Amino acid sequence: MYKKLKLTTISELIKNIYCSLSVLIIGCASAYAVEFNKDLIEAEDRENVNLSQFETDGQLPVGKYSLNALINNKRTPIHLDLQWVLIDNQTAVCLTPEQLTLLGFTDEIIEVAQQNLIDGCYPIEKEKQITTYLDKGKMQLSISAPQAWLKYKDANWTPPELWDHGIAGAFLDYNLYASHYAPHQGDNSQNISSYGQAGVNLGAWRLRTDYQYDQSFNNGKSQANNLDFPRIYLFRPIPAINAKLTIGQYDTESSIFDSFHFSGVSLKSDENMLPPDLRGYAPQITGVAQTNAKVTVSQNNRIIYQENVPPGPFAITNLFNTLQGQLDVKVEEEDGQVTQWQVASNSIPYLTRKGQIRYTTAMGKPTSVGGDSLQQPFFWTGEFSWGWLNNVSLYGGSVLTNRDYQSLAAGVGFNLNSLGSLSFDVTRSDAQLHNQDKETGYSYRANYSKRFESTGSQLTFAGYRFSDKNFVTMNEYINDTNHYTNYQNEKESYIITFNQYLESLRLNTYVSLARNTYWDASSNVNYSLSLSRDFDIGPLKNVSTSLTFSRINWEEDNQDQLYLNISIPWGTSRTLSYGMQRNQDNKISHTASWYDSSDRNKSWSVSASGDNDEFKDMKASLRASYQHNTENGRLYLSGTSQRDSYYSLNASWNGSFTATRHGAAFHDYSGSADSRFMIDADGAEDIPLNNKRAVTNRYGIGVIPSVSSYITTSLSVDTRNLPENVDIENSVITTTLTEGAIGYAKLDTRKSYQIMGVIRLADGSHPPLGISVKDKTSHKELGLVADGGFVYLNGIQDDSKLTLRWGDKSCFIQPPNSSNLTTGTVILPCISQN
């Protein structure tokens, strides 16, 4: 076998050699015809040279060709069948009005094209400000046009006409957890849990069901088990109105009213369909774990996010930006201690561009968590935001029921430019609770956000809300109507966050404060302060230290925590750390740890922690953890042991499985709100995808998880690490998927080999220098004839037949099979077809 040459195509190599000889060619990259001076070519038979295919760059013979298209250097996610027509004795690319629409040209340009069609298409280079360049080797057309002539200005924005709903298929995204806790005295306990989402896609429709399972054991005997399906729903995008339609069990999504679980139908303008700079944000959740702990974020008792975290401060920053309303946070320590609090995910109600409207509406019946029963009352809710002026938006909404509850809200949002963003709204409720008279109440809310560009700081005063005693939310009314009494009548709440990075000091400051008061219950206040700084100590660079103080107030119990951490990088992938923590009992504990991630896909850590007495008595807690990222999922293992006290073991695995009519594959975890992309390598195994984030299985199927929706994404094959004798033609795939889609592409995969040979005609002569050698079936160029008939052929298959054409002559070659191939130069007889 011959080692692959890391080149593009031989034709490009020879072309570049010719282009470098300025005396032979002038303006090689232009679209003008040139004539080669054959006297400067050192060849035995100078006249037997045919370089006609290099004499005109940027042109193709009259006809239709399938090409990739780039518009202002941005790859489009489609192949276009483009025509070349003859104009002024030269061929030029000619686009139909439909193709101009797909490429994102404005209606004005398309109207001009429709008025000047030639054979049903328009030669776009008639517009002086439009230029094209054809890369024949890649069969790729680059179009350069004024940005003002294009509808979409964002480089990552793709016209809805190019969005891909994907193919039919099914998937399961799963998270598995197992734990074992064994105290020195007392009963052992075990727990097995899982949560995730299953789905089926058909066209633009997506069927989804969330699931969560929990099983507890005591000394191996089952104590309790619970299987819930919190949501079963059907949804689809409606690109024509930038909206998402949902039918089934879902949660109301609102920037004004509290969220609740319901069964029915909803329609919401989807800001993910808007350009990226108009999209919202999700909250950051911070806290401190005292041991190896499991952090669970849920809403309406539905698990949204779950993660195992080591001792010390943690931050969850990757929640979906679609979350609205109160989120419940629970930290379960390995010794059974549980800490809970709430955070608000309400963003400042969106400002809307002048003249535009955003909206959401839903109707149905409230549903108990788990979806096993419908509740009263029947409701309809809706809200909107209208861009009244450039910097002023009006918004409002209502909740109407067939019982004794109605709510109406109105507000205004201001873009104060350098002063930040401000919104204010008032909500009125009319409700009659059980055994009470009908009451009218009001709630007032203000939000403010400001980023100080000069200092890089961010201040958010989100969700200040005051409600009088008679104000009733829809959640409170649902609880009262269905005889649930464990709810609190909120009086006042607010959240303040401040973030500041001081570059000169390499110091980052983060402060958050949240307060809730109630008319009929005690108030709670949660706050945290975090300072972190990087510095150098002699040869030790980027040593980091952080100080975190937090107070969590829950059900009249204050939990104060203080944590100091110092981390010393040891090379580029190892870290030595020391942490000191003071808990609510004023006990001080110390932790020393070592973390190693020198292997790209594996990491491990060991630590010892305890207070002064525990270290003195050799009773410090010893912990170890191991994480392994694979193409099929992520494995996490951890264990803790404390002499004469307890030991615990924890394990988790998360991954996904996707199946379509083209095949199926296990793969890395894909977030349930994300799309995914299936690659079919035509049976080729171990094809690395997207920098080895995924690999094709034994059937040639691989799935790239967590592909962003409504954003142009390029997916690639790592051609540098292909298996031996495998070639990929279309190594880059560009796509724009709609939410939840299963994208699909089949690679032009060739299990092939290479040949170095000399082409010999029947009379012993050789074909002219520069002639293309092409595959007879695919017409793909496999090599170019050099001096003396020498040729390097790449991409040969056992059933390949090769053809050569020059002038009125042609011949074909039957190359030897790979099993019969010998080393050295091979004589390749070319049999005349004339």
Where would I find each of the regions flagged by the language model?
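Short Pro-Gly-centered beta-turn/loop motif in secreted/extracellular proteins
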Residues: 86-95, 319-324, 701-727, 738-739, ...
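Feature captures outer-membrane beta-barrel proteins of Gram-negative bacteria and organelles
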Residues: 163-164, 192-204, 225-239, 376-398, ...
